[in-house]
């Protein structure tokens, strides 16, 4: 029953404890745990049956004694205090300030699981978000209200890319309030310091809320961290009409925590030991992105995950791909060439790109230009494979130009400095500069009027 205190802990294993002899306990209920020394911890009911409850302890079960530990069931779900004062602040994985600032005085307390959105109430994601990164803005455009994951690999610079996007992202042409909610799960101290430094030194912290769950924090915190971040994002977006970009890194660490807790509960494992409900669990996070009819605000998600062994068929990227609307894929081959960000545009995809670009949103030539760049780069890449077999001497003059285009595309369009913030117009103009490498007769995916208007050969004549 709510408010009842029990001293009937029968077993502690991993992050879980079993409490016997309980009554009226509900799934998801918040639990207060007190040790013999008076230390207080929080937990949540994972399972309740008959007179027994399984509780997950957020701060871990270290030093808990089954004989002296007392447990109180509050009768409430886990809630996060929310306030506009959270902008500019850094919190740990369960929402406690770690930046030396004061505690947040909440304007409200919100359930971390959010309120389910009626699908009919959703507005279709539209409108361009500029990240300042050409390979995303030009080729795999991010749209307001979209969920677009970044598929990375161990050792690739996804943390740098995440920090750069968080710093540079903006909505164009409107006096919209823009905010970033950044949640990191299972990161090292070095990575945490990198993110803090990146946000604070560039001033991006002023419009951001950071949640940092460290690698040595209890795994159970990683289950809560993204939900904390999304609850704050929903508050900023739908109460204050802000355009919110939520960056979640690393969702692989989240899924590993899910597997660890599932194993502790002795559940029947699914693919590669992950719980069978991982798809549903990931959907409860990703589906909190979007826009709502009648509301000006929006939530756009960019989850980042490292693919184990660079395997895109691994359950984590595989299931993520089913739920989200595309993917940005980082390439180890491009990284070896010294190209940053190493975004491989060929396997990358933004399914909602067509609804966020073109006349009135970016520029009229954007859709056809991106298709032409994609086709030309794909041709150049396939010719590289051919050269490895027959040698460059067997290629025609046009083929050699495609090879040169592919090299320049990687070095000049994909590659850019960590501190370089390109506007969409700079990106599109750069695309035309590269297409000038090819014969005009090869530009079959772009209308003649756009060639006459934007091709460097004609643009310079007009000037």
Curated annotation (Swiss-Prot):
Main subcellular localisation: membrane
Pfam families hit by this protein: ATP-synt_ab, ATP-synt_ab_N, ATP-synt_VA_C
Membrane-topology descriptor: Peripheral membrane protein
Cellular component GO terms held in the UniProt record: plasma membrane; proton-transporting two-sector ATPase complex, catalytic domain
Location within or outside the cell: Cell membrane
Gene3D superfamilies the record matches: 3.40.50.12240
The entry's keywords: ATP synthesis, Cell membrane, Hydrogen ion transport, Ion transport, Membrane, Transport
Keyword Membrane: yes
Domain of life: Archaea
One GO term of the biological process aspect: proton motive force-driven plasma membrane ATP synthesis
Single annotated GO MF: ATP binding
Function: Component of the A-type ATP synthase that produces ATP from ADP in the presence of a proton gradient across the membrane. The B chain is a regulatory subunit.
Family: Belongs to the ATPase alpha/beta chains family.
Name recorded for this polypeptide: A-type ATP synthase subunit B
Organism per entry: Thermococcus sp. (strain KI)
């Amino acid at each position: 029953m709510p408010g009842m205190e029990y001293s009937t802990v029968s077993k502690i294993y991993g992050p879980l404890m079993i409490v016997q002899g309980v009554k009226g306990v509900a799934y998801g209920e918040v639990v207060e745990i007190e040790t013999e020394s008076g230390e207080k911890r929080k937990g949540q009911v994972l399972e309740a049956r008959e007179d027994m409850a399984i509780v997950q302890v957020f701060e871990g079960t270290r030093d808990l004694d089954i004989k002296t530990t007392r447990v109180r069931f509050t009768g409430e779900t886990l809630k996060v205090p929310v306030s506009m004062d959270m902008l500019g602040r850094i919190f740990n994985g369960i929402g406690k300030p770690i930046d030396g600032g004061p505690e947040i005085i909440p304007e409200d307390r919100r359930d971390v699981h959010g309120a389910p959105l009626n699908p009919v109430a959703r507005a279709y994601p539209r409108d361009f978000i500029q990240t300042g990164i050409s390979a995303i803005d030009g080729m795999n455009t991010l749209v307001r209200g979209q969920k677009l994951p970044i598929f990375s690999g161990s050792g690739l610079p996804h943390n740098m890319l995440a920090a750069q996007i968080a710093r540079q992202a903006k909505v164009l042409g409107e006096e919209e309030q823009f905010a970033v909610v950044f949640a990191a799960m299972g990161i090292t101290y070095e990575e945490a310091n990198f993110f803090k430094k990146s946000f604070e030194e560039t001033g991006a912290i002023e419009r951001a809320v950071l949640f940092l769950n460290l690698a040595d924090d209890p795994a159970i915190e990683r289950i809560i961290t993204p939900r904390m971040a999304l609850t704050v994002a929903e508050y900023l977006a739908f109460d204050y009409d802000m355009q919110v970009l939520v960056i979640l890194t690393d969702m692989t660490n989240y899924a590993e925590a899910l597997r660890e807790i599932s194993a502790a509960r002795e559940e029947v494992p699914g693919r590669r030991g992950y719980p069978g409900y991982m798809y549903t669990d990931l959907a409860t996070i990703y589906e909190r992105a979007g826009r709502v009819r009648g509301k000006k605000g929006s939530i756009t998600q960019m989850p980042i995950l490292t693919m184990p062994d660079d395997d895109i068929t691994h359950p984590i990227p595989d299931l993520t791909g089913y739920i989200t609307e595309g993917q940005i894929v980082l390439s180890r081959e491009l990284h070896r060439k010294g190209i940053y960000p190493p975004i491989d545009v060929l396997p990358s995809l933004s399914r909602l790109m067509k609804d966020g670009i073109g006349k009135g949103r970016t520029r009229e030539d954007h859709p056809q230009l991106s298709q032409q760049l994609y086709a030309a780069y794909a041709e150049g890449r396939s010719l590289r494979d051919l050269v490895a077999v027959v040698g460059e001497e067997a290629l025609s003059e046009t083929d050699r130009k495609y090879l040169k285009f592919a090299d320049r595309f990687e070095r000049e369009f994909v590659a850019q400095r960590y501190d370089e913030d390109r506007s969409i117009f700079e990106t599109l103009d750069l695309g035309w500069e590269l297409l000038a490498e090819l014969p005009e007769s090869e530009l079959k995916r772009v209308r003649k009027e756009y060639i006459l208007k934007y091709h460097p050969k004609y643009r310079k004549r007009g000037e």
